[in-house]
A protein has these predicted regions:
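Sec-dependent N-terminal signal peptides of Gram-negative exported proteins
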Residues: 3-21
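Cysteine-dependent hydrolase recognition
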Residues: 22-368
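Basic side chains
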Residues: 2-3, 51
Length: 368
């Protein structure tokens, strides 16, 4: 295992243009609850007092279907329009910056098309466009929409500059997993190590993003491994990025890390956010060749496993995003380290919206 070296000029330069960030709180959050779902209601009841969410900031949907995937017409009728109505009725369109969905709110929208022209997307990523839609703008369903906030680290997040909502999800395998997210977000502290696990020492694009992330953080806080070995068993981890099941040498479902409160995760994996249903205990990751070993249509690692193991935030993908539209670790972790909250850190790192990305976590989580 090789620890990275730090170019101090890079670290100083990263924040050279950073503006003072205004403190955000529960009044800036719209919490979306499916009142037809017991788990969704229970999550809301726990989160509301923890973050001081005003009751007018709680948007109650009535979605009877239990499927994680819905078609476009149901998304518009049962999710997007009711949320827009909640924002308008409560006079919150401008003040709300973050939308938080919960278990019981559909996860993904099915649609025709393939590849970069696919009309399928994550519910949360489509909801990010709701602010602009409420202002009268329309967007094509096919393919990603450029994220105006991407890499704009020098500017505070405001609707005047960035006409979107930052949408995260409180989700896990069960209530205890989600309770853990909330509790750990409140206990987040600026300590621990950032672990970057390259799948080899080659100069692939994803590997270079990991190298750049390592150089943008204090060297005594970074572990970077460029060997073919998969990093496991690390302790005091506050950030992790790697290739997940796309690393040919990874065969175990869990990494066995000890995660600190506030720990964030990125993986370069196509379908890690495909479901929050719990796999059988004996299931583990595999290859695309062995269909019998797949879970929920894929053999790949799962976002929910990181949350279950103790991470506080994790990105994921409901369908194939393509590497260039993954969150960028070289943007996420420096932003988080330098004071951005969870939602802003992840969305700064994502090139596209109306796409396959989800962010699991409390948007207000911040290192202190």
């Amino acid at each position: 295992m090789r620890r990275s070296t730090l170019a101090l000029g890079w670290l100083a330069g990263y924040c050279a243009g950073c503006s003072a960030l205004p403190a955000q709180d529960g009044t800036n959050v719209l919490l979306v609850v499916n009142r037809a779902d017991k788990l969704s209601r229970r999550i809301a009841d726990y989160y509301i007092p923890k973050r001081g969410i005003p009751l007018k900031n709680v948007c109650k949907l009535d979605i009877l279907e239990e499927d994680e995937e819905i078609p476009w017409d149901k998304y518009v009728e049962e999710v997007e329009r009711p949320i827009a109505h909640c924002l308008t009725k409560a006079g919150l369109r401008e003040h709300v910056l973050y939308i938080v969905t919960t278990m019981g709110v559909p996860l993904k929208v099915s649609g025709p098309g393939e590849g970069i022209a696919a009309e399928s997307c994550a519910v949360d990523s489509e909801l990010a466009l709701l602010y602009s839609k409420m202002k009268g703008k329309s967007f094509p369903r096919a393919g990603p929409v450029p994220n105006p906030f991407y890499r704009r680290k020098e500017q505070p997040f405001t609707h005047a500059s960035f006409p979107i909502y930052l949408v995260t999800r409180l989700a896990g395998y069960d209530f205890d997993d989600v309770k853990g997210i909330i509790d750990r977000s409140l206990a987040a502290r600026d300590q621990g190590k950032f672990v970057f696990d390259l799948k080899s020492d080659d100069d692939s694009e994803g590997n270079n993003w990991l190298r750049t992330a390592a150089l943008a953080l204090p060297k005594d806080r970074v572990v970077m491994d460029e060997s073919v070995k998969v990093v496991t068993g690390e302790k005091d981890v506050i950030g992790y990025a790697g290739w997940g099941s796309n690393d040919p040498n990874r065969h175990q479902r869990n990494l066995g890390f000890q995660w600190l409160p506030g720990a964030l995760v990125i993986e370069y994996v196509s379908t890690d956010g495909r479901t929050f249903r719990r796999p059988p205990a004996e299931w583990t990751i595999g290859t695309w060749k062995g269909v019998a070993g797949w879970f929920d249509g894929s053999p790949q690692t799962l976002t929910a496993d990181y949350i279950h193991e103790g991470a506080t935030g994790c990105s994921g993908h409901v369908y194939e995003p393509f590497l260039e539209l993954n969150p960028r670790p070289d943007v996420l972790f420096p932003a988080y380290f330098h004071g951005r909250n969870l939602a802003e850190s992840y969305y700064l790192s994502m090139p596209g919206l109306s796409w396959q990305n989800i962010v699991v976590g409390d948007p207000l989580c911040k290192l202190k």
